[in-house]
Protein backbone atom coordinates (compact mmCIF):
# COMPACT_ATOMS: atom_id res chain seq x y z
CA UNK A 1 0.00 0.00 0.00
CA UNK A 2 1.15 3.54 -0.64
CA UNK A 3 2.33 5.60 2.30
CA UNK A 4 -0.74 7.19 3.86
CA UNK A 5 -1.06 10.75 5.12
CA UNK A 6 -4.05 10.25 7.42
CA UNK A 7 -2.14 10.95 10.67
CA UNK A 8 -1.17 14.35 9.25
CA UNK A 9 -4.78 15.02 8.23
CA UNK A 10 -6.05 13.94 11.65
CA UNK A 11 -3.73 16.36 13.44
CA UNK A 12 -4.83 19.22 11.22
CA UNK A 13 -8.56 18.65 11.80
CA UNK A 14 -8.06 18.06 15.50
CA UNK A 15 -6.37 21.44 15.81
CA UNK A 16 -9.02 23.43 13.91
CA UNK A 17 -12.17 21.55 14.97
CA UNK A 18 -13.76 24.36 16.97
CA UNK A 19 -12.99 27.07 14.44
CA UNK A 20 -14.25 25.00 11.52
CA UNK A 21 -17.56 24.22 13.20
CA UNK A 22 -18.23 27.96 13.48
CA UNK A 23 -18.90 27.88 9.73
CA UNK A 24 -22.12 26.06 10.65
CA UNK A 25 -22.94 27.89 13.88
CA UNK A 26 -22.18 31.36 12.52
CA UNK A 27 -20.48 32.28 15.80
CA UNK A 28 -18.07 34.65 14.08
CA UNK A 29 -17.78 38.34 13.41
CA UNK A 30 -19.82 39.84 10.59
CA UNK A 31 -16.91 40.04 8.14
CA UNK A 32 -15.87 36.44 8.81
CA UNK A 33 -19.45 35.24 8.28
CA UNK A 34 -19.66 37.15 5.01
CA UNK A 35 -16.38 35.62 3.82
CA UNK A 36 -17.67 32.13 4.64
CA UNK A 37 -20.88 32.79 2.71
CA UNK A 38 -18.84 33.83 -0.33
CA UNK A 39 -15.75 31.61 -0.32
CA UNK A 40 -17.26 28.55 1.38
CA UNK A 41 -20.74 28.68 -0.06
CA UNK A 42 -20.52 25.12 -1.33
CA UNK A 43 -20.21 23.87 2.27
CA UNK A 44 -23.81 24.97 2.76
CA UNK A 45 -24.82 23.86 -0.74
CA UNK A 46 -23.46 20.34 -0.28
CA UNK A 47 -25.42 20.03 2.97
CA UNK A 48 -28.64 20.94 1.16
CA UNK A 49 -27.73 18.54 -1.67
CA UNK A 50 -27.27 15.63 0.74
CA UNK A 51 -30.59 16.27 2.47
CA UNK A 52 -32.38 16.54 -0.87
CA UNK A 53 -30.83 13.36 -2.27
CA UNK A 54 -31.40 11.22 0.82
CA UNK A 55 -35.02 12.31 1.10
CA UNK A 56 -37.08 10.38 3.64
CA UNK A 57 -34.62 8.64 5.96
CA UNK A 58 -37.11 7.36 8.52
CA UNK A 59 -36.03 3.96 9.79
CA UNK A 60 -32.77 4.00 7.81
CA UNK A 61 -29.32 2.95 8.98
CA UNK A 62 -26.78 5.58 7.91
CA UNK A 63 -22.98 5.88 8.04
CA UNK A 64 -21.23 9.26 7.79
CA UNK A 65 -17.58 8.73 6.85
CA UNK A 66 -15.55 11.76 7.91
CA UNK A 67 -18.44 13.01 10.03
CA UNK A 68 -16.54 15.93 11.56
CA UNK A 69 -18.59 17.85 14.11
CA UNK A 70 -21.72 15.81 13.41
CA UNK A 71 -23.86 18.28 11.46
CA UNK A 72 -25.16 15.65 9.03
CA UNK A 73 -25.50 13.03 11.77
CA UNK A 74 -27.75 15.13 13.98
CA UNK A 75 -29.94 16.22 11.07
CA UNK A 76 -30.48 12.63 9.94
CA UNK A 77 -31.41 11.70 13.50
CA UNK A 78 -33.89 14.57 13.73
CA UNK A 79 -35.41 13.38 10.45
CA UNK A 80 -36.12 9.97 11.91
CA UNK A 81 -33.22 7.74 10.85
CA UNK A 82 -33.10 4.59 12.97
CA UNK A 83 -29.38 4.87 13.65
CA UNK A 84 -26.44 6.90 12.41
CA UNK A 85 -22.77 6.02 12.83
CA UNK A 86 -20.23 8.81 12.43
CA UNK A 87 -16.62 7.87 11.73
CA UNK A 88 -13.77 10.38 11.99
CA UNK A 89 -10.04 10.52 12.70
CA UNK A 90 -10.09 13.70 14.83
CA UNK A 91 -10.98 13.28 18.53
CA UNK A 92 -11.89 16.95 18.95
CA UNK A 93 -14.34 16.73 16.06
CA UNK A 94 -16.01 13.73 17.68
CA UNK A 95 -16.31 15.59 20.99
CA UNK A 96 -18.16 18.36 19.17
CA UNK A 97 -20.34 15.78 17.41
CA UNK A 98 -21.26 14.01 20.66
CA UNK A 99 -22.08 17.33 22.31
CA UNK A 100 -24.24 18.35 19.35
CA UNK A 101 -26.39 15.22 19.25
CA UNK A 102 -26.77 15.39 23.03
CA UNK A 103 -27.90 19.02 22.87
CA UNK A 104 -30.32 18.16 20.07
CA UNK A 105 -31.77 15.27 22.07
CA UNK A 106 -30.94 12.59 19.50
CA UNK A 107 -27.90 10.92 21.09
CA UNK A 108 -29.70 7.58 21.46
CA UNK A 109 -29.87 7.28 17.67
CA UNK A 110 -26.17 8.05 17.12
CA UNK A 111 -22.76 6.60 17.80
CA UNK A 112 -19.33 7.86 16.92
CA UNK A 113 -16.16 5.95 16.10
CA UNK A 114 -12.62 7.32 16.28
CA UNK A 115 -11.06 5.60 13.29
CA UNK A 116 -9.88 5.83 9.73
CA UNK A 117 -12.44 3.94 7.67
CA UNK A 118 -9.47 2.14 6.13
CA UNK A 119 -8.87 0.36 9.45
CA UNK A 120 -12.46 0.17 10.71
CA UNK A 121 -14.53 -2.99 10.61
CA UNK A 122 -18.13 -1.90 10.23
CA UNK A 123 -20.36 -3.79 12.69
CA UNK A 124 -23.32 -3.81 10.28
CA UNK A 125 -24.56 -2.86 6.82
CA UNK A 126 -25.92 0.62 6.14
CA UNK A 127 -28.79 1.67 3.88
CA UNK A 128 -27.05 4.97 3.15
CA UNK A 129 -23.42 6.04 3.42
CA UNK A 130 -22.04 9.52 2.85
CA UNK A 131 -18.50 10.90 2.57
CA UNK A 132 -18.66 14.69 2.34
CA UNK A 133 -15.63 16.94 2.85
CA UNK A 134 -13.59 13.74 3.01
CA UNK A 135 -11.97 13.00 -0.35
CA UNK A 136 -10.26 16.39 -0.37
CA UNK A 137 -7.67 14.92 2.01
CA UNK A 138 -7.34 11.34 0.78
CA UNK A 139 -4.15 10.47 -1.07
CA UNK A 140 -5.33 7.10 -2.33
CA UNK A 141 -9.17 6.77 -2.49
CA UNK A 142 -9.65 3.29 -4.06
CA UNK A 143 -9.24 1.12 -0.97
CA UNK A 144 -11.44 3.34 1.20
CA UNK A 145 -14.09 3.36 -1.51
CA UNK A 146 -14.05 -0.43 -1.64
CA UNK A 147 -14.50 -0.58 2.12
CA UNK A 148 -17.43 1.84 1.97
CA UNK A 149 -18.92 -0.27 -0.80
CA UNK A 150 -18.65 -3.37 1.41
CA UNK A 151 -21.01 -1.97 4.05
CA UNK A 152 -23.35 0.10 1.86
CA UNK A 153 -26.52 -1.57 0.60
CA UNK A 154 -28.53 1.27 -0.91
CA UNK A 155 -27.09 4.73 -1.60
CA UNK A 156 -23.67 6.37 -1.42
CA UNK A 157 -23.34 10.15 -1.59
CA UNK A 158 -19.92 11.73 -2.02
CA UNK A 159 -18.46 15.17 -2.71
CA UNK A 160 -15.13 15.68 -4.48
CA UNK A 161 -13.25 18.98 -4.96
CA UNK A 162 -13.11 19.85 -8.65
CA UNK A 163 -9.84 20.13 -10.51
CA UNK A 164 -9.17 23.44 -12.30
CA UNK A 165 -11.29 25.90 -10.39
CA UNK A 166 -10.02 29.29 -9.22
CA UNK A 167 -10.10 28.04 -5.64
CA UNK A 168 -7.89 25.03 -6.33
CA UNK A 169 -4.49 26.84 -6.19
CA UNK A 170 -5.70 28.97 -3.28
CA UNK A 171 -6.59 25.90 -1.21
CA UNK A 172 -3.41 24.11 -2.28
CA UNK A 173 -1.23 26.95 -1.02
CA UNK A 174 -3.24 27.67 2.13
CA UNK A 175 -3.79 24.09 3.28
CA UNK A 176 -0.81 22.15 1.98
CA UNK A 177 2.02 24.66 1.94
CA UNK A 178 1.05 26.96 4.82
CA UNK A 179 -0.97 24.77 7.19
CA UNK A 180 0.63 21.43 6.36
CA UNK A 181 -2.51 19.51 5.39
CA UNK A 182 -2.40 17.70 2.02
CA UNK A 183 -5.32 18.44 -0.29
CA UNK A 184 -6.37 16.78 -3.56
CA UNK A 185 -8.58 17.63 -6.54
CA UNK A 186 -10.36 15.46 -9.08
CA UNK A 187 -11.71 15.58 -12.62
CA UNK A 188 -15.13 14.15 -13.45
CA UNK A 189 -13.65 11.15 -15.34
CA UNK A 190 -11.38 10.38 -12.38
CA UNK A 191 -14.30 10.35 -9.95
CA UNK A 192 -16.45 8.22 -12.24
CA UNK A 193 -13.64 5.67 -12.65
CA UNK A 194 -12.90 5.56 -8.92
CA UNK A 195 -16.53 4.85 -8.10
CA UNK A 196 -17.00 2.32 -10.89
CA UNK A 197 -13.82 0.44 -9.99
CA UNK A 198 -14.98 0.26 -6.36
CA UNK A 199 -18.27 -1.37 -7.33
CA UNK A 200 -20.64 1.58 -7.59
CA UNK A 201 -22.89 2.75 -10.40
CA UNK A 202 -23.31 6.51 -10.74
CA UNK A 203 -26.98 7.51 -10.54
CA UNK A 204 -26.39 11.27 -10.83
CA UNK A 205 -23.37 13.55 -11.12
CA UNK A 206 -23.80 17.24 -10.32
CA UNK A 207 -21.59 20.30 -10.10
CA UNK A 208 -22.26 22.04 -6.79
CA UNK A 209 -20.10 25.12 -6.47
CA UNK A 210 -16.49 23.94 -6.65
CA UNK A 211 -17.50 20.31 -6.02
CA UNK A 212 -18.47 17.17 -7.89
CA UNK A 213 -21.45 15.78 -5.96
CA UNK A 214 -22.24 12.18 -6.84
CA UNK A 215 -25.17 9.94 -5.99
CA UNK A 216 -24.12 6.32 -6.54
CA UNK A 217 -25.50 2.83 -5.93
CA UNK A 218 -23.67 -0.42 -5.14
CA UNK A 219 -23.73 -3.00 -7.94
Protein language model annotation of sequence segments:
Residues 63, 71-114:
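Class I SAM-dependent methyltransferase SAM/SAH-binding core
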Residues 138-148:
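A short, conserved alpha-helix within the catalytic core of class I
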Residues 1-54:
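Conserved class I S-adenosyl-L-methionine
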Residues 163-181:
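Short, glycine-/aromatic-enriched active-site segment of Class I SAM-dependent methyltransferases
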Residues 153-161:
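Conserved beta-strand signature within the Rossmann-like core of class I S-adenosyl-L-methionine
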Residues 128-140:
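A short SAM/SAH-binding and catalytic strip from SAM-dependent methyltransferases
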Residues 182-198:
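Short alpha-helix
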Residues 68:
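Conserved glycine-rich SAM-binding loop
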Amino acid sequence: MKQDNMPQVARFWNDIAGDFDKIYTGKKGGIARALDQYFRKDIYQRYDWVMEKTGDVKGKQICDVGCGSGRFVTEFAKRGAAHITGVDVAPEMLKLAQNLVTQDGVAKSCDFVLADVLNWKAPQKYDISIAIGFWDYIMDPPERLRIIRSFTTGQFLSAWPRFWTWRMPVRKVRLQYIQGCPVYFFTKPQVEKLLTDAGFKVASFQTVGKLHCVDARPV
